[in-house]
């Protein structure tokens, strides 16, 4: 499907994104899959092995056909937009390393993403989750692992990928955790006693020896715990207790921000805690909280009774 030169360039591109651009593992996997899909489509479109000549000759018709195929395959708008970003990134890399120029690819506009408000759980729903997450797990150490991880995410507002990257080295300071977030941006987060105590208990029960620089959250075989595995535990929880369908590890990060805002924290502080580059990203939580207040107002105001 691909000639040798392109295969070698893809490997170099992946190393470039990982080592020089410090892209997250999640982004690397997504970009790699997007490029693979694009090149498979190019192979089908031209009925021939993909060579540098075909890469260079990609025209508006091919690009639009590929985007249409993504839409027909039920890719959501955000995934289509990300796929286009991946292809543009690859072509930009080819400009630098292979002196290959294609202005058509860069002229394609990204589809507009619908602005979905982050969905937060109510405090009651969070408490139900924290109280019962230990019921899911086939051994005691996995049960306490699940609770420790969920409490850590909600107490600190971490992304699931950030929480799963925590090592013993992160735990040396009893008051703060230093996290390396998106774009290699470091932030400092208060280290609450409830999360610290649960993690200490979890490490005491963990049946595997870990080096100080190894991620502490492990799967049942002792390998680093992966987000889909933990989210499967949350699926069991939400189905049994009738919790919202959107409940996921990430919804507890949203809940962290929304509950802080509802309890008087200022936006700038929440922005720093979440590691948002732009304040406008954090402001979406204002809309969520206002919506929550509207619902409470309509339900509880005496004039409606």
UniProtKB/Swiss-Prot annotation:
SUPFAM superfamilies: DNA breaking-rejoining enzymes. GO terms for molecular function: DNA binding; tyrosine-based site-specific recombinase activity. The active site is at residues 159, 182, 250, 253, 276, 285. Residues 4-95 form the Core-binding (CB) domain. Keywords: Cell cycle, Cell division, Chromosome partition, Cytoplasm, DNA integration, DNA recombination, DNA-binding. Pfam families: Phage_int_SAM_1 (PF02899), Phage_integrase (PF00589). GO terms for biological process: cell division; chromosome segregation; DNA transposition. Site-specific tyrosine recombinase, which acts by catalyzing the cutting and rejoining of the recombining DNA molecules. The XerC-XerD complex is essential to convert dimers of the bacterial chromosome into monomers to permit their segregation at cell division. It also contributes to the segregational stability of plasmids. Forms a cyclic heterotetrameric complex composed of two molecules of XerC and two molecules of XerD. Belongs to the 'phage' integrase family. XerC subfamily. HAMAP family: Recomb_XerC_XerD (MF_01808). This is Tyrosine recombinase XerC. The gene is xerC.
